[in-house]
């Protein structure tokens, strides 16, 4: 039981870390809001994005 809970916690933490990746092509520098980010990954424009501590991150998907 403990092992299962530990494995689930590790998987949850890894998925949370991998959910965001820095967008190196973001045109907004020093973004303040979600709308300031422009994501251009995988040939798509304007996917869901997030601004964390002034850096633009695109959500996978």
Swiss-Prot record:
Tissue expression: Expressed by the venom gland.
Name recorded for this polypeptide: Putative neurotoxin-D
GO MF assignments: ion channel regulator activity; toxin activity
This protein's UniProt keywords: Disulfide bond, Ion channel impairing toxin, Neurotoxin, Secreted, Signal, Toxin
Species whose genome carries this gene: Lychas mucronatus
Signal sequence bounds: 1-19
Principal subcellular localization: secreted
GO CC term, one of those recorded: extracellular region
Paired cysteines (S-S): 31-51, 37-56, 39-58
Cell compartment(s), UniProt: Secreted
Origin superkingdom: Eukaryota
């Amino acid at each position: 039981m403990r092992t299962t809970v530990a494995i689930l916690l590790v998987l949850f933490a890894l998925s949370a870390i991998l959910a965001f990746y820095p967008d190196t092509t973001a045109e907004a520098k020093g973004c303040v809001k979600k709308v300031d980010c422009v994501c251009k990954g995988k040939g798509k424009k304007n996917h869901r994005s997030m601004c964390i501590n002034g850096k633009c991150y695109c959500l996978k998907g």
